[in-house]
């Protein structure tokens, strides 16, 4: 046999999705030419098969090899792959790339080497969207090695001779839209999953004891956009059961026994929850117990066979009939498909094409010992059992419904589950082609004392499809004969009570139905989402295949539910799935769907992060707090800017256990650069807005929320600010707010006043609440008078001295005059103590209104003096700076220097023990 491909033969590289499929395709196509030869490729698991064949009358030398599922992986650039390398919010827009992982490099090399020697590339990947995406991964590799390749797509639904030969003789072009839809889904899932997973894990893992054994350091609290709505169905049903309060009800039951049997009549009202009303009606019936037959209805009823078998129905029925998990069902179905016994098991289609030769498929089953006789009857025209399958209304345009493709009485290597699933597929197919079952149903209605009761009975006249489909039953009871007007006294007439019951936990078939109805996942991925919930310990499944949430699963759903965001509901994912379907049919572009979905989910992410306390509260309901060092708990890691001190790491926003906010370098402890934010903050979150002024950048703006009691009344509590030094409003707010122990300057000199010393050495906790109406003294020595606003003012006796200077009564130092730059108070003057640790503040006009003015009013000289004092004080504060965030050898060299959010250095040491390596709030001697 000639294998060289000479004589004008076209060399054709055929690529299948799995090695077993490649072997089956090669065996089928090589039979006419007398066989094939096999050799190893670069990967020992993916062999290359060679043989001669004819396509469209043209001689071809065929080379058949395979990949093993997806050849490429989508991943973030290296600088974003480490968990602490970036703010999780950055992952919504971080660069991604698709590349061949190391463990598949051998497959890649095989494809490249073979592609260089071929003229055609024929893709035998699974004929669904996922398979089309893998096909384009193969195209990228092969076309990169040989750009002149003529690329074709083989479309098939079963690994049988007829299908494979038909596919290779009617080659098509690959569908880029299908591949784009999968690309969009992969990128959306990667970005959403990675961002929420990092957020949840870093926020909660080290903060709580999640594992009773204590070995929970490697736990990943994953979030998946399909996985979480699936968990939501389980939790929602669980909550519904927990919220159910049993309620007693009462109903009247009646029975009548005659020579023909017993009939049980039910009350038309069903039941009543009011006992008194039920007793009154029951007593009426007991007093007048004669029953009168008011109506007798006899009608023919039909029970129709099921629709042709789709993937979701296969999973649901296997779960219901055999208690097989959806994940195991798909594994067994895939093995049956690859062995050629059933058609492709991943399909949404539930109607057969008119061109399908259904009789031939039935004919293959006539030899089976269990259902062969039924198959013969089905093909017999005189039996009148044949009926074309019903149309279920779904067609994915890729594959037919699941049906048998090869006869088997049971292979020696089959497990019980292989036998059960093959039997289900065959019996389901035979049932689809059968007449419905026929029954005669009788309904009898009676009246007792004005109350209506009825009873129903059924007799099956022709079982038809029920003869082969043993999984369905259609029983009934035979009623005695009644005629209209007949009267009788009931044999029993009772008032019975019962209790309402909650719905049961979701079974796997029910869960699959919920997912299918809500559009969560696809027929090929639903089982995988369920498996992940079990693997991640978010849910458990009992022996009856019913699901319950674990404490961890319930806590996460509860946390998001408390936020008010329906991230655990199916609506968002359902919209995404609809968008991806739109990409696959060309009504929306991949870029459009990516932009819309990621923009929506990033907004949800930022909102969730801003309300992370809800997650903490929910987790605290189920889990004990961890005793691990708080430094390991990454409660909030949000990148603000590159560190200008070490030029190596990022600076990030973090909230300490005490509630304070800081911006520190990730390079700690090698780099100790830190910005202490004021303790008047109640919240802070980094936004995605970049400051256009500050460098080195990017410098992300922070959304600050101040406590109203700790800032002047005319400032907004919400402020979008920049810590890079350009934000004048933020500087004012910083200067007007107490910093507590973190912002204290060097230890006060001995010659300072006792008042000032007292302020400095007071409790760092008691000193936080700044009064914005403190005492005021003028330097002209006048006696202060307290005004209604709480200020002290001095009455001037002469106009020439009317502009007395404002003095801080705590520090006894002249105040500086500043100008507000906020929207509400732009241009308004205020007095501020020169001492950064002092919280003195007063509006200029309030001070003026509290004291009589001379005819000349305040002179300009006073303002000039204040400005000079302000400039001098500011210059004095800057004098000792020797770099940001480093320990300096300038003023107070024995202490530590930090950078305040105003951009100015802050020196200090612990005022309790004098240690320069920490401040008093973390001093081990605190409280002794």
Swiss-Prot record:
Binding site for Mg(2+) 1: 17, 126
Disordered, as annotated region: 389-410, 741-806, 849-892
Residue span, Topo IA-type catalytic domain: 175-606
Matches recorded under SMART domains: TOP1Ac (SM00437), TOP1Bc (SM00436), TOPRIM (SM00493), ZnF_C2HC (SM00343)
Enzyme class per UniProt: isomerase
Ranges annotated as biased composition (Polar residues): 741-765, 777-806
InterPro entries named among the record's database cross-references: Topo_IA, Topo_IA_2, Topo_IA_AS, Topo_IA_cen, Topo_IA_cen_sub1, Topo_IA_cen_sub2, Topo_IA_cen_sub3, Topo_IA_core_domain
One cellular component (GO) term of this entry: RecQ family helicase-topoisomerase III complex
Residues engaged in binding Zn(2+): 808, 811, 833, 838
Zinc fingers classed as GRF-type: ranges: 808-847
Zn finger region (C4-type): 643-671
Pfam families: Topoisom_bac, Toprim, Zn_ribbon_GRF
Cofactor: Mg(2+)
Domain Toprim, first and last residues per copy: 11-157
Region (Interaction with DNA): 222-227
The protein's role, per its UniProt record: Releases the supercoiling and torsional tension of DNA introduced during the DNA replication and transcription by transiently cleaving and rejoining one strand of the DNA duplex. Introduces a single-strand break via transesterification at a target site in duplex DNA. The scissile phosphodiester is attacked by the catalytic tyrosine of the enzyme, resulting in the formation of a DNA-(5'-phosphotyrosyl)-enzyme intermediate and the expulsion of a 3'-OH DNA strand. The free DNA strand then undergoes passage around the unbroken strand thus removing DNA supercoils.
Protein name: DNA topoisomerase 3-alpha
Native source organism of the sequence: Oryza sativa subsp. japonica (Rice)
């Amino acid at each position: 046999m000639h294998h060289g491909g000479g004589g004008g033969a076209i060399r054709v590289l055929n690529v299948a999705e799995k090695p077993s499929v490649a072997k089956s395709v090669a065996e089928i196509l090589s039979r006419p030419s007398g066989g094939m030869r096999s050799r190893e490729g670069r990967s020992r698991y993916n062999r290359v098969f060679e043989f001669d064949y004819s396509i469209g009358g043209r001689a071809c030398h065929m080379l058949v090899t395979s990949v093993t599922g997806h050849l490429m992986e989508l991943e973030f650039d290296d600088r974003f792959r480490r968990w602490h390398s970036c703010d999780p919010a950055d992952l919504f827009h971080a660069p991604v790339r698709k590349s061949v992982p190391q463990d598949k490099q051998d497959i890649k090399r095989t494809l490249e080497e073979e592609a260089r020697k071929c003229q055609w590339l024929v893709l035998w990947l699974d004929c669904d969207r996922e398979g089309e995406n893998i096909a384009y991964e193969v195209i990228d590799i092969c076309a990169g090695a040989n750009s002149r390749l003529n690329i074709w797509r083989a479309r098939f639904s079963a690994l049988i001779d007829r299908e494979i030969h038909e596919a290779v003789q009617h080659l098509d072009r690959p569908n880029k839209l299908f591949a784009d839809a999968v690309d969009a889904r992969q990128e959306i899932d990667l970005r959403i999953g990675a961002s929420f997973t990092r957020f949840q894990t870093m926020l909660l893992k080290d903060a709580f004891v999640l594992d009773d054994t204590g070995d929970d350091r490697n736990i990943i609290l994953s979030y998946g956009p399909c996985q979480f709505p699936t968990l939501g169905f389980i939790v929602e049903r669980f909550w519904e059961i927990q919220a159910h309060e049993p309620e007693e009800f009462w109903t009247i039951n009646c029975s009548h026994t005659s020579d023909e049997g017993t009939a049980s009549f039910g009350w038309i009202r069903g039941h009543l929850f009011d006992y008194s009303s039920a007793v009154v009606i029951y007593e009426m019936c007991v007093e007048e117990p004669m029953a009168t037959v008011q109506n007798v209805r006899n009608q023919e009823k039909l029970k129709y066979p099921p629709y042709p078998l789709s993937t979701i129905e296969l999973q649901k029925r296997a779960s219901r009939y055999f208690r097989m998990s959806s994940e195991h069902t798909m594994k067994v179905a895939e093995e049956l498909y690859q062995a050629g016994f059933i058609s492709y098991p991943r399909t949404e289609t539930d109607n057969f094409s008119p061109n399908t030769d259904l009789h031939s498929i039935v004919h293959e089953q006539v030899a089976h010992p269990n259902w062969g006789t039924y198959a013969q009857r089905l093909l017999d025209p005189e039996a009148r059992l044949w009926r074309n399958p019903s149309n279920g209304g779904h067609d994915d345009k890729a594959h037919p419904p699941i049906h048998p493709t090869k006869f088997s009485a049971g292979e020696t290597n089959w497990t019980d589950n292989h036998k059960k699933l093959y039997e289900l597929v065959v019996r389901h197919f035979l049932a689809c082609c059968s007449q419905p079952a026929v029954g005669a149903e009788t309904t009898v209605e009676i009246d007792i004392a004005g109350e209506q009761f009825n009873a129903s009975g059924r007799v099956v006249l022709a079982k038809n499809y029920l003869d082969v489909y043993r999984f369905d039953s259609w029983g009934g009871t035979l009623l005695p004969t009644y005629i209209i007007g007949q009267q009788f006294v009931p044999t029993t007439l009772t008032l019975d009570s019962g209790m309402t019951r909650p719905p049961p936990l979701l079974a796997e078939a029910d869960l699959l139905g919920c997912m299918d109805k809500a559009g969560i996942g696809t027929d090929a991925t639903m089982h995988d989402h369920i498996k992940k919930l079990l693997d991640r310990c978010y849910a458990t499944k009992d022996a009856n295949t019913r699901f319950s949430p674990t404490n961890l699963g319930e806590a996460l759903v509860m946390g998001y539910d408390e936020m008010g965001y329906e991230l655990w509901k199916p609506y968002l994912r359902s919209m995404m799935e609809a968008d991806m379907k739109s990409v696959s049919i060309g009504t929306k572009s991949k870029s459009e769907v990516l932009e819309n979905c990621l923009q929506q989910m990033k907004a949800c992410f930022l909102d969730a992060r801003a309300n992370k306390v809800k997650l903490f509260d929910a987790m605290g309901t189920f889990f004990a707090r961890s005793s691990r060092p708080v430094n390991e708990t990454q409660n909030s890691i949000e990148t603000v800017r590159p560190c200008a001190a070490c030029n190596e790491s990022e600076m990030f926003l973090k909230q300490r256990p005490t509630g304070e906010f800081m911006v520190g370098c990730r390079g700690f402890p090698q780099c100790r650069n830190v910005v202490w934010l004021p303790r008047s903050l109640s919240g802070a979150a980094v936004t995605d807005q970049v400051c256009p002024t500050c460098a080195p950048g990017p410098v992300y703006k922070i959304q600050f929320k101040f406590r109203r009691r700790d800032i002047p009344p005319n400032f907004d509590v919400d402020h979008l600010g920049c810590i890079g030094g350009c934000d004048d409003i933020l500087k004012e707010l910083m200067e007007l707010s107490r910093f507590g122990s973190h912002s204290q300057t060097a230890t006060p000199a001995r010659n300072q006043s006792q008042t000032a010393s007292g302020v400095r050495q007071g409790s760092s906790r008691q000193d936080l609440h700044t009064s914005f109406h403190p005492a005021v003294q003028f330097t002209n020595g006048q006696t202060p008078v307290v005004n209604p606003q709480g200020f002290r003012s001095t009455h001037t006796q002469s106009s020439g001295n009317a502009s007395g200077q404002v003095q801080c009564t705590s520090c006894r130092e002249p105040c500086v005059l500043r100008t507000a730059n906020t929207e509400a108070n732009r241009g308004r003057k205020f007095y501020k103590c020169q001492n950064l640790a002092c919280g003195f503040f007063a509006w200029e006009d309030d001070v003026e209104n509290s004291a009589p003015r001379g005819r000349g009013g305040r002179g300009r000289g006073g303002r000039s003096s204040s400005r000079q004092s302000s400039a001098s004080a500011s210059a004095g504060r800057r004098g000792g700076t020797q770099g940001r965030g480093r320990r300096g050898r300038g003023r107070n060299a024995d202490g530590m220097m930090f950078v305040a959010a105003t951009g100015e250095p802050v020196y200090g040491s612990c005022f309790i023990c004098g240690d320069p390596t920490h401040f008093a709030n973390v001093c081990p001697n605190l409280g002794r």
